[in-house]
Amino acid sequence: MNTYTETEKEQALGVIESVVGRCEKVWPKFAEGTSQQSLLKNRIKALYIAKALISGEEKRDGYGKEELQQALAPIESIISKCEKARLKFEDGSTHYVRFSKMIEAMDIAKAFLEDEINKR
């Protein structure tokens, strides 16, 4: 069971919505059927699932266990990429803080996904 505060969940949702917006903005720039477009599609879907779980939306029950499990990989990928990128910046810098917030949000998303998978 997750013990995140409402503030933590709201902040995570804000970050997730921002990431979804950026992903949807670049979506048309990739050619149909390319690996980049496929990865982006999976990332967007995973973020929408995470958003539904964190916010407690009713449609979260519409996701099957397999969909939830598939959503873990893109979330873990975001965490990994942000951790690597954050190493390039000084603690307290704008970029460091931005990556830290994204890591925190994705950690929350991952926890909600894992909890939901374990319930099924």
Tell what function each PLM region has.
Residues 35-45, 69, 94-104:
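Short, charged, amphipathic alpha-helical segments
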Residues 12, 26, 33, 50-52, ...:
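Low-complexity, intrinsically disordered tandem-repeat tracts enriched in small residues
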Residues 5-8, 17, 24, 31-33, ...:
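Polar/charged low-complexity regions in secreted precursors and cytosolic/nuclear IDRs
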Residues 7-24, 43, 67-83:
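Short amphipathic alpha-helical heptad-repeat segments
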Residues 25-38, 59-63, 84-97, 118:
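Charged, low-complexity interaction regions
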Residues 46-62, 85-88, 105-120:
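Amphipathic alpha-helical coiled-coil segments
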Residues 1-8, 114-120:
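Terminal, compositionally biased segments
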